[in-house]
């Protein structure tokens, strides 16, 4: 199942271009270019957590693109679009209930462009996109651990022809852009929720914290690379399973029969920025579980070293984490498809 965002975007006639100066503007050829922005849904499409619907505000920027250049990442000129109130240098669009939005503006015929699309929840205070070429992540921002408002989607695209090659804008220009999460989603799942409850633990008050080492904090939106490195500690929060109206559990669609369609107590969920390559980047993760919201309520602290985190994948830490310090299994699940990698 896919969610489709419709976006028609371009530079308005009030702006000048290298070959279209202000005094020649009335002679410039402008065309309306239509972009279909597609954000694939999460594998658990019926769930409210991590289904992508919280990323309801779209910000985009338009930059010139030189078809003859070998590097278009050193952009000096932002084609300045103004709408909404997020930042005067970007256009912000609120999607409707069907996750669709349309902006009508124009591009100059015969010019090539590149686009940065960023979709997030407007209430998420953890992303700084004042420079749309370098989006910064604040892991101590307004959104706490286990809160799906951190979910966001990103894409960089260039105007292309029917053969998907970089090209100039022509009449009737249209293009599809696919958004992906630039993050890895880290989840902690308890296989022993029932056993813990039978042993007298009040599973309705379970809280968790998490620390992830060596996390990037800047996304270069023009080439997809990341930079920065910090050890990120997410503050204590109520378990996802207990903090949702539907008492959602972590469901894993794994090829491995031991995990296929099983449900686990969803104790923690966090998004961290990771590189698209190399695909085998590893991080050390520590998470602590509490039967209340104070340090004195600590149950267990678990650590897992060299955990693989992949962009646009979900990494699950699964085990009997509430009743004993035992084996924690690591599963890597590609976020928008129906199979898992288990090791």
Where are the model-predicted features located?
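Extracytoplasmic cysteine-anchoring/structural motifs
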Residues: 20-343
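Bacterial Sec-dependent N-terminal signal peptides
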Residues: 1-30
